[in-house]
Amino acid sequence: QTCALPISWEDFEKADFEEVQEDRGSARINRVYRQLSVCPVMYWEKNDDADALYLKNQRQWISKYLKENLGGNLEIYKNMACLTLENDDCYGTVHPRDAMLPEAVLLVCQKIQDELAIGKLEKTENERIFMSRKKFADLVHECRDKWLAGWSKEFREMDEKKLLETIVKYMEDWLMIRCENEQIVIYPATGRLSGVYPDDFKGDVKK
């Protein structure tokens, strides 16, 4: 004999809704951990972004879990979060590293920060900076002109178009910028790391 409990369509709908909510919660947790562990940075547009709220509310536990399993420190800012690793914890390709391209990008990031500080550039409410592709190209070439002696032979002699494409691709890959036709969107990660040569830099030419 089969026994059945009385159940209504409302019960089915409630059960389905609860399962959906549970699935969404699990998906959100997986998404947040995945972004922090395999992506350079995690961004959000609005303060009420569900992933961002989960991250902020659970930052203590997320930070603890990531540190125990991957090392490093969880850093959370207004519209971004990232996992920064010490040298001993690093895995895969890292930024920055001891190579000319990351070094050039650090100088470009510093130039952007300098122009922001003096009012030549402005941030939007969600921490983005919008710049024409030409303006960005001029900024890159200004960095090379200023620090030419410190750049490697390959980068000193690289034509302007290739230099721009090389730096743009690197910064896109590391989620620092996004290209939109003739406009460059600069993301908050650009302000996270930057570099300058020391004040006593004499311009020793790199091979």
For the regions a protein language model found, what residue spans apply to each?
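Extended, charged coiled-coil "stalk/tether" helices of large eukaryotic trafficking and scaffold proteins
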Residues: P188-V205
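Minor-groove-contacting beta-hairpin "wing" of winged helix-turn-helix DNA-binding domains
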Residues: A81-L85, Q183-G191
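Short acidic, hydrophobic short linear motifs in intrinsically disordered regions
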Residues: V38-D49, E122-F155
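Short, small-residue-biased leader/transition segments that mark boundaries at the very start
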Residues: C3-L5
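Short amphipathic alpha-helical interaction segments
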Residues: Q1, F155-Y170
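Short, contiguous acidic/charged loop-to-helix segments that flank catalytic cores in large enzymes
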Residues: G92-A99, K120-R128, A149-D159, R192, ...
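Long, low-complexity, charged/polar intrinsically disordered regions in eukaryotic proteins
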Residues: N47-I118
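Glycine-centered, phosphate/nucleic-acid-interacting loop/turn motifs that mediate DNA/RNA or nucleotide
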Residues: W174-L175
